[in-house]
Amino acid sequence: SEMCIRDRPMDIPKLDPATVKYLDFSDVKGQENVKRAMEIAAAGGHNILMVGPPGAGKSMMSKRLPGILPDMTREEMLKSTEIYSVAGLTGKNNPIISARPFRAPHHTVSGAAMSGGGAVPRPGEISLAHNGVLFLDELPEFRKDVLEVLRQPLEDGEVTVSRVAGTETFPANFMLVCAMNPCKCGWYGHPSGRCRCSANEVRA
């Protein structure tokens, strides 16, 4: 017997970065110094660390950073789509990754989830952030071994994942944005004088 197999056409949207909608800096009132620092970081491709009390807007500003990065090129879109496809994160509703990725893993994330893993190696958070932003909120809360995972990709722009099934190297060229409180209670240096942390606690 014979079976006739036909291609099933699928509508692929045009690779047009102009159609991408980002959160906008114009939504944020004030914070001009922070906006300026983020503009400089975005223009130069620099990593950035924000330190401030709770409610200062660190997360809000970070989520708007992709909106001031350059539009993705066709090659960047295809590479990011390839990564997301391998991770099983593409589908009918999002066949093409045309927006700068913004990944914000929780501080309880494991090293394998950050770098990539599985019986068959799959991309982790740092590769899913390729061509975009990796945001680490509450930086001191991340485990040391998880932060160590960032060393190779920050230096080489890629990460190598070794498992029994084989070794894979995934792209991992991202802008690292970190945020943290200045002390355990979060209020050190605030004009309200609410901080009750000791000098040793602040240094820790």
Predicted regions and their residues:
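Conserved ASCE/P-loop NTPase catalytic core
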Residues: 26-204
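Short, small-residue-biased leader/transition segments that mark boundaries at the very start
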Residues: 2-5
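Acidic, proline/serine/threonine- and glycine-rich low-complexity intrinsically disordered segments
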Residues: 7-8, 179
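Pre-Walker A segment
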Residues: 9-37
